[in-house]
Amino acid sequence: MCAKKIVVLPGDHIGPEIVASALEVLKVVEKKRPELKLEFEEHKIGGASIDAYGTPLTDETVKACLEADGVLLGAVGGPEWTNPNCRPEQGLLKLRKSMGVWANLRPCNFASKSLVKYSPLKPEIVEGVDFCVVRELTGGCYFGERTEDNGSGYAMDTWPYSLEEVSRIARLAAWLAETSNPPAPVTLLDKANVLATSRLWRKTVAKIFKEEYPHLTLKNQLIDSAAMLLVKSPRTLNGVVLTDNLFGDIISDEASVIPGSLGLLPSASLSGVVGKSEEKVHCLVEPIHGSAPDIAGKGIVNPVGTILSASLLLRYGLNAPKEAEAIEAAVRKVLDDTSIGGRGLYTRDLGGEASTADITKAVVEELEKIL
C-alpha cells in the first residue's frame, strides 16, 4: 500500500493549534480506513521559518510540498515580523506560485443549520445558502503589466487573460457542478458589459458548457449585481460561482461573513482535478482566517475551518469523498443544537465557552462513530 504524503505547515501564532486539531481528525480517518494510509511531514513557513532559517519559505519546504499529495496550512503572519523585504506572507505567495495552483475554492454554507442565527443577515435570507466560489488565482490584473505613479500623477494596471486560463477553470467549475448531488448550476460573475476580458470569459465559458456540458445549467451575472444579491438574496447564487481573480477576491470575502464567523470556513487551492489531469495535481488547503496573535496560546480558537480544510484535502487532494463527507457530518453533529440531537458546542467567536480542545475531542468522537 502506497501512503499518501501530506505536508503540514503549522505557520504562526494560532496556526499550530488549529493544525493540531485537524491532524487529530485525519488520524481518526487513517485509523478507521486502513486502506487510506497517510504520512505526515511537518515543515515551517512564514514567521516561524524566518525565525529558524531567515526566510519565510525554504527550498526544502517547497520541494516537500511539490512531492506531496496535499499540503495542510495553518496561518501565517504577525506584528513581530516587520522587515518589508522578509515578510511571513511572502512565504505563502511563493508557495502558491511554486505549486502552480490556479483555482481557489471557497465554500459558503452553514456547517450546521443551527449556525444560521449567528449570521449578520436575517435567518430567512440566509437559510439554505450553499455555494462555492471558484476563483481564478494566477491571472488577471494582479499579474498584468503595470505602471506605477512616478510623480507624474498617472498609474496603470492591465487585466490580461488567455483562452487557456479561462478554459481550464471553466472545466474545473463544471466538474464541481457535475459531482454535486444533484448537479449544481454554475453562475459566471463578470463585467462583460464593460471589460474585454470579461467578454472573453463569457464567450469561452459559454462555448465549453454548450459543447462539453450541455446537461449543466450556466447562468451569467454581472459582478456588481452579484454583490447586491449576496446580501439581498444569496440563495440565488447557490451552486458553483465562477469568476476571475479580482472579482473572486472581493466576492469571496463578502460571502465569508454570511456564516457568522471566519473561524468556520475552509478553502482549497488546486492545480487541477485528481484523476482528470495527466500532470500531478497539487492541493493546498487552509482556513480563511489569519494568525490571530491576540488569542494565540489561549486554547480558545475555533478549529472548525481547519478541520473542514482537512475535509477538502481528502476530497480534492486524495480523492476520498466519503471520508470528507464523514468529517463534515461529524462537525455538523458537534455544532447542531441539542434540541435537534447535536452537542451544541461553540467556541467564543460564536458566543460559546467551548475550548479548541473541546471541539476537537467532540469531532473526533463523532467521527469515530460515523466511520
Curated annotation (Swiss-Prot):
Sites where the protein binds substrate: 96, 106, 135, 224
Major place of residence: cytoplasm
MF terms in GO: 3-isopropylmalate dehydrogenase activity; magnesium ion binding; NAD binding
Catalysed reaction, written as an equation: (2R,3S)-3-isopropylmalate + NAD(+) = 4-methyl-2-oxopentanoate + CO2 + NADH
Family annotation (SMART domains): Iso_dh
Record EC number: 1.1.1.85
Modified residues annotated as Phosphothreonine in this record: 55
Record site feature (Important for catalysis), residues: 142, 191
Name the record gives this protein: 3-isopropylmalate dehydrogenase
